[in-house]
Amino acid sequence: TDSCPWSHGSLASNTMYRVGWATRAAANDARRQLLEIAGREFFDNAALDDLDITEGIVHLRNEDASNRRVSISEVLHVLRSDTLGQTSSITGRPAVPMPPATTFARQFGAQFVEVEVDIETGQIKLLDFVAAQDSGTVVNPQVLKNQVVGGGICGAGFAIYEHLVFDEDTGAIKNGNLLDYKLLRAADFPWKAEVLFAESYDPVGPFGARGAGESPIAAGISAVAQAVYNATGVWVDLPMTPERVVRALGGV
């Protein structure tokens, strides 16, 4: 925190905005430093606007590709040092705080869940999971898929298991540990979860992207709740524990 500027923190689905813009600004700063060194050392003090980087190679914008070309590693070699612990590196840093207008945008998601409900025991089993997510430009497909699936797991856990039990006399939490506070395990969620991306372009997000923190959780809760209703014909209070399912079905 000594070198981190003040911010609202990684919350409210703002991480893509805050970290994304900061990373992009830092990368642009590092690129600027790299081109300054390259222009001075290899291109006769060429201006920044006259240089470009293509696939790790620094070159003049308006010259044929066969002309002077220098790799990034060669540029960094200029910074070499014989001092132990010194490395040839450039550190990029964003120069200004991110404007407040770039910290929020709505995200959209829908999830579909197939469940099996045992009407005798009230047990709910998740059979299939499909999600559609619009979080702007998909910067990293695998990371976004993991985020959506993780949100779906969290939402399903809220719908089926997770709740705090309080002592009626003292108000103390009675299940304040992972032995008594039930969570979904890997085996409880469909292993072949499918995520579809509906890409759009967010005008204020980094590269048109926006967050995906909360919508997968909210969609997961409602998807499981409605799937149980479609299977049983009754609405069950959340979390839909076996006891509550049996009671809703008139078995208790």
Feature map (PLM): residue ranges:
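C-terminal catalytic domains of large/alpha subunits in multi-subunit enzymes
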Residues: 1-252
